[in-house]
Amino acid sequence: MSAIILGIESSCDDTSAAVIKDGYLLSNVVSSQAVHEAYGGVVPELASRAHQQNIVPVVHEALKRAGVTKEELSAVAFTRGPGLMGSLLVGVSFAKGFARSLGIPLIDVNHLTGHVLAHFIKAEGEENIQPKFPFLCLLVSGGNSQIILVKAYNDMEILGQTIDDAAGEAIDKCSKVMGLGYPGGPIIDKLARQGNPKAYTFSKPHIPGLDYSFSGLKTSFLYSLRDWMKDDPDFIEHHKVDLAASLEATVVDILMDKLRKAAKEYKIKEVAVAGGVSANNGLRNSFREHAEKYGWNIFIPKFSYTTDNAAMIAITGYFKYLDKDFCSIDLPAYSRVTL
């Protein structure tokens, strides 16, 4: 009998629903919220209200595109955390009510696990090459920077993580200082393609082990701009492409330095990247260069799977469904939770 899983994602400012049948993606609908751009960041209350408006039509559209009726669903998987509590509660509450009304199992999914397992989403007509266990996954986003040893679908170990800011957060804040707008990641990425990555040098942390730190880079960037603008008030406008390229190169160097160490220490050649920052062109190019130089088998997600989406929640739910790993209807959402 087929396993058809509805996945629901509402951890931040994207409302998403997806349907997976026997591991194959049938639909993935994402509704993004433009309302936050005017505020230079996500406003939790506005995000929660938008989720309430979007959740029903998004789920309806996901089922419609999949050609599946709600009565055919085997289970409902939802993001339990981490994320914004007000946003999470919308998805969690809907999933509970929907599953209960249909009399089908409920499956809680860790948002971070979903990003890692996005590499196992299969789609008809696409090349479906997946990493072999064990593999390393660099999970980088606005809220997380982690090196994860993935031993199985349900067995992961964090080898290193940021002790302060995440990589994506540092990029967004530096972009904001430059007056480039929100979200900063895609803007920096676009500008960096036109600039010289060696034009400027910024501070790199010396953190023991496999942990990361990006607060020093952020401070170095801010102080450097302040000094340069004393001599030239229009310095940012005149040099923004080189600034973006140098910032991006520094972040990528920091990320890849620790990932190389992890790959060498654990003798692993299967290496993946996941999370919002995995859409960055400089990071993707660095992965390809490392694959050629060190013989890595690399796995870079489709752009549609880098940002928050329900397809990754549905595939994680599918694996948990096969293990009959269901949750109780009284399970709470968690704004802060690790793997």
From Swiss-Prot:
Cofactor(s) listed in the protein's UniProt record: Fe(2+)
SUPFAM superfamilies xref list: Actin-like ATPase domain (SSF53067)
Pfam families to which the protein is assigned, alphabetical: TsaD
PROSITE patterns on file: GLYCOPROTEASE
Enzyme Commission numbers on file: 2.3.1.234
Cofactor note: Binds 1 Fe(2+) ion per subunit.
Subcellular location per the Swiss-Prot or TrEMBL entry: Cytoplasm
Residues given in the record as substrate binding sites: 139-143, 172, 185, 189, 280
Source organism, top-level taxon: Bacteria
Keywords: Acyltransferase, Cytoplasm, Iron, Metal-binding, Transferase, tRNA processing
GO annotation terms (biological process): tRNA threonylcarbamoyladenosine modification
Positions contributing to Fe cation binding: 111, 115, 308
Membrane-crossing residue ranges in chain numbering: none
Catalytic activity line of the entry: L-threonylcarbamoyladenylate + adenosine(37) in tRNA = N(6)-L-threonylcarbamoyladenosine(37) in tRNA + AMP + H(+)
Cited InterPro entries: ATPase_NBD, Gcp-like_dom, KAE1/TsaD, Peptidase_M22_CS, TsaD
HAMAP family hit by this protein: TsaD
Protein name: tRNA N6-adenosine threonylcarbamoyltransferase
Organism: Bacteroides thetaiotaomicron (strain ATCC 29148 / DSM 2079 / JCM 5827 / CCUG 10774 / NCTC 10582 / VPI-5482 / E50)
Gene expressing this chain: tsaD
